[in-house]
A protein has these predicted regions:
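Cleavable N-terminal signal peptides
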Residues: 8-9, 19
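Acidic, Ser/Thr/Pro-rich low-complexity intrinsically disordered segments
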Residues: 61-147, 155-158
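Bacterial N-terminal signal peptides that target proteins for export
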Residues: 1-8
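C-terminal edge strands of extracellular/lumenal beta-sandwich accessory domains
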Residues: 22-58, 103, 131-158
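N-terminal targeting/docking segments
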Residues: 2, 19-20
Length: 158
């Protein structure tokens, strides 16, 4: 079993917990328009990582975009050695079926999440400071959707 799969198994209790969506304990509504859904997920990710859904000071990086099936894009982010980071990509389930994410350093994949889902995530403690690349690939939009809205978010946890 790959290390990323073991890490995902360790996160199952966290992933099965309700996501913050305005009121503690409520689930994000997958039928919301993409921008509203992603705004709720942004707060939910901050809440999971820092205990505060409005702690934007912990947000190292945040971008939104849209990709068609099979398309990918990259984002550059600076990470510090020894920092604890949570890296999330979420796509709006009203148009998205599967999105994948990889973290690269000096062209080498150091973390990846290729599970069949709409919320790839992982934690990392970099062994070196520097520029890292987040590659987002829209594996599958829902039928009838030319592109899917997504966001990528990096949160410093310590």
């Amino acid at each position: 079993m790959k290390l990323t799969h073991l890490a995902a198994l360790a996160l199952l209790p966290v992933l099965s917990a309700p996501v913050f969506a305005g009121d503690a304990g409520s689930l994000s509504n997958p039928n919301l328009p993409p921008a509203q859904f992603l705004a709720q997920e942004r707060k939910g990710n901050l809440n999971m990582s820092t205990g505060n859904p409005n702690n934007r000071a912990a947000e190292v990086f945040y971008r939104t975009g849209a990709l068609g099936t099979g398309k990918s894009t990259t984002h550059s982010v600076s990470l510090r050695e020894g920092g604890v980071y949570a890296i999330y990509t979420d796509c709006a389930p009203s148009s998205c079926e599967n999105v994948d994410m990889e973290l690269l350093h000096n062209g080498r994949v150091v973390r990846e999440d290729h599970m069949d889902d709409t919320y790839p995530l992982f934690h990392i403690i970099p062994s070196r400071s520097g520029a890292y690349t987040i590659r987002v690939k829209m594996a599958q939009c829902k039928p009838g959707h030319a592109s899917c809205a997504y966001h990528t978010q990096v949160i410093k946890e310590n």
